[in-house]
């Protein structure tokens, strides 16, 4: 079921991007990746600050984490706060980009290569949507609730996305798990 939802989100993202056209989608994509770089620089100090404001569920010796060992699960609060800070900065930057994109809406009708303009723009938007899906699933892996951890049982789509996504899986595992725990 979750796999179907992911596919529908990616199809909707492709449709939205292809309707925008490459010129406008490049504005949105550039803003997203600029926000990504800002979030990458700021998430660590802010992750420590929000730990005082945002509660993290306590991990008990009986807690079963789908993707982490028992030892790692006791230190996942650091990774959780870092992930929340990163996603928060990325979300704020994405909203600012969407707002600024309103002023660039005239680019919607600018076509670089009319034959493939929609395909390129749709593909760019799918990449952004996939990154969001990955980040949400990665954040969920850090929450020690059985119902949420059940989403990541062996062979599930969310688990595959979190573990096997090219570039993203290793990058965020290094940034949020290995470097912090």
Briefly describe each language-model feature range:
Residues 1-181:
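Alpha-helical transmembrane segments and their juxtamembrane interface "caps"
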């Amino acid at each position: 079921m979750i796999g179907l939802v992911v596919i529908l989100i990616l199809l909707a993202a492709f449709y939205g991007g292809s309707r925008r056209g490459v010129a406008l989608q490049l504005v949105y994509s550039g803003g997203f990746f600029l926000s990504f770089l800002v979030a990458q620089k700021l998430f660590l100090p802010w992750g420590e600050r929000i730990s005082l404001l945002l509660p993290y569920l306590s991990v008990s010796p009986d807690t079963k984490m789908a993707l982490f060992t028992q030892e790692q699960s006791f230190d996942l609060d650091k990774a959780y706060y870092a992930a929340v800070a990163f996603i928060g900065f990325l979300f704020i930057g994405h909203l600012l980009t969407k707002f600024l994109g309103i002023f660039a809406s005239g680019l919607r009708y600018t076509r670089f290569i009319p034959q493939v303009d929609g395909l390129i723009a749709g593909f760019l938007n799918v990449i952004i949507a996939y990154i969001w899906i990955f980040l949400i699933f990665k954040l969920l892996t850090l929450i020690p609730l059985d119902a949420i951890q059940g989403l990541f049982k062996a062979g599930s789509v969310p688990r595959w996305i979190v573990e096997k996504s090219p570039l993203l899986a290793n990058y965020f595992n290094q940034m949020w798990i290995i470097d912090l725990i």
